[in-house]
Amino acid sequence: MAGIDLNADLGEGFGVWRLGDDDAMLGIVSSANVACGFHAGDPAGLLRVCRSAAERGVRVGAQVSYRDLAGFGRRFIDVAADELLADVVYQIGALQAIAHAAGSSVCYVKPHGALYNTIVTHPAQAAAVAEAVRLVDPGLPVLGMAGSVFFDEAARRGLRVVAEAFADRAYRPDGRLVSRREPGAVLADPAAIAERVLAMVETGAVTAVDGTRLALSVESVCVHGDSPGAVQIATAVRDRLRAAGVEIRAFC
């Protein structure tokens, strides 16, 4: 069976405050979505994560977001397109320098949180993010949701789009993620999540919260590093995929 990428959000601590177990997750995933300082992450912590990723052969991606430290990037911001474009260029550039100093490089871009969800349907912001990536490096793939306006804008600019699925998030019937504010939005049982991911990879489909079967394009699977039991969930997913003969490998 073909391989699949496993990605996780890392580098999201700040100062003395730590979120998740970055070191443990880097021993499991093939790609690390590293924060760029706008929703989380400080320079020393980001350098540490990039160094560890380089040592383990884990690919580094720039996890760009709204300028929202207090809200962890999970709040929609009605920012002008030109300002958002500049913010994304800045974030990619900052992480490129840190990754280079760590002996690695940024090989893809993934929007974070509210920005990720917004550009599924918001044409102006989707275009701004896609254009920012193109301006920095048109060879950088973008990781996101298949069928999104963001993917349309990225493809229009010649960017490679990489579709991802979420291991531990519930899906709505329209294919979008259930809001974290709603009960059952974040899944927690490692064994059940692992079986769900294997089914996604093997069948190209997932069951929404109302029982609807949704077609799902999957090149990468996100296992959130900040979820309760994240390491156990990621380990279960990796082990189940490997047991089924699915190779864990990066897409870039």
Swiss-Prot record:
<comment type="similarity">
    <text>Belongs to the LamB/PxpA family.</text>
</comment>
<dbReference type="InterPro" id="IPR011330">
    <property type="entry name" value="Glyco_hydro/deAcase_b/a-brl"/>
</dbReference>
<comment type="function">
    <text>Catalyzes the cleavage of 5-oxoproline to form L-glutamate coupled to the hydrolysis of ATP to ADP and inorganic phosphate.</text>
</comment>
<dbReference type="GO" id="GO:0005524">
    <property type="term" value="F:ATP binding"/>
</dbReference>
<keyword id="KW-0067">ATP-binding</keyword>
<dbReference type="InterPro" id="IPR005501">
    <property type="entry name" value="LamB/YcsF/PxpA-like"/>
</dbReference>
<keyword id="KW-0378">Hydrolase</keyword>
<protein>
    <recommendedName>
        <fullName>5-oxoprolinase subunit A</fullName>
        <ecNumber>3.5.2.9</ecNumber>
    </recommendedName>
</protein>
<dbReference type="GO" id="GO:0005975">
    <property type="term" value="P:carbohydrate metabolic process"/>
</dbReference>
<keyword id="KW-0547">Nucleotide-binding</keyword>
<dbReference type="Pfam" id="PF03746">
    <property type="entry name" value="LamB_YcsF"/>
</dbReference>
<dbReference type="GO" id="GO:0017168">
    <property type="term" value="F:5-oxoprolinase (ATP-hydrolyzing) activity"/>
</dbReference>
<comment type="subunit">
    <text>Forms a complex composed of PxpA, PxpB and PxpC.</text>
</comment>
